[in-house]
A protein has these predicted regions:
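Conserved GNAT-fold acetyl-CoA-binding loop/helix
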Residues: 47-69
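Conserved beta-strand in the GNAT
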Residues: 82, 88-97, 113, 118
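A short beta-loop-alpha structural element at the N-terminal edge
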Residues: 30-44
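Conserved GNAT acetyl-CoA-binding A-motif
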Residues: 140-152
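Conserved acetyl-CoA binding element of GNAT-fold acetyltransferases
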Residues: 105-121, 170-173
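Conserved acetyl-CoA pyrophosphate-binding loop and the N-cap/start of the following alpha-helix
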Residues: 123, 127-135
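Conserved catalytic-core motifs of GNAT/GCN5-like acyltransferases
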Residues: 97-102, 149-151, 155-157, 161, ...
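A short helix-loop-beta-strand connector motif used in the catalytic cores of GNAT acetyltransferases and
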Residues: 70-82
């Protein structure tokens, strides 16, 4: 699997906090923000996403994910929009907010880190990921972020480039 790092400058049209219902092909879908009552299912889907991307499971990630999401949802530094068909979560998104020292292309120092973009295989190619992406990017804009960053999976590259993300050739990472 090839992982590509991309970055976007925020300019996409706004999304709203209003729940939107869409019906097509027997599917009645809603877009809603993640709340604590849906967190266990969200975490299950996050782990499915990581498996699908080829991650090696050598630890139980559930406790760490639950701790992370609880802390960062509470302090406002993580937000997620979900696509829901009835009671079933069929698509997820996530945006974490970090702050770094300001620099010329990002004077606020605030950056969005996009994660948890996942759509149930039975619901792919219906525009769900694009709608979720537009909502979390708007959350980043509203937070004051100057950019959004992501490490894109093979499957996500087309979605992100069509949306306006561009590769950032200077990105490097040091792993412990």
């Amino acid at each position: 699997m090839i992982i590509v790092n991309v970055i976007i400058t925020l300019f996409y049209p706004p999304a709203t906090d209003i729940i939107i219902e869409i019906s097509f092909g027997g599917i009645k879908m809603e877009y809603v923000k993640l709340t604590e009552d849906k967190l266990d299912e969200f975490i299950r889907l996050r782990i499915n996403q990581l498996r699908e991307e080829g991650a090696t499971e050598d630890i139980d990630l559930v406790p760490a994910l639950k701790d992370y999401y609880n802390r960062h949802m509470a302090d406002g530094t993580f937000v997620s929009w979900l696509a829901v068909d009835g009671e079933k979560i069929i698509g997820t998104s996530g945006m974490s907010f970090v702050e770094r020292p300001p620099y010329f292309s990002c004077p606020s120092g605030k950056t969005g880190i996009l994660s948890s973009m996942y759509t149930d295989p039975d619901y792919r190619r219906m525009g769900i990921a694009k709608e979720l992406l537009s909502r979390v990017v708007e959350e980043a804009r509203n937070y004051g972020c100057g950019s959004v960053q992501i490490t894109a999976s093979d499957m996500g590259v087309l979605l992100y480039t069509d949306f306006g993300f561009v590769k950032n050739g200077n990105f490097m990472q040091y792993k412990f």
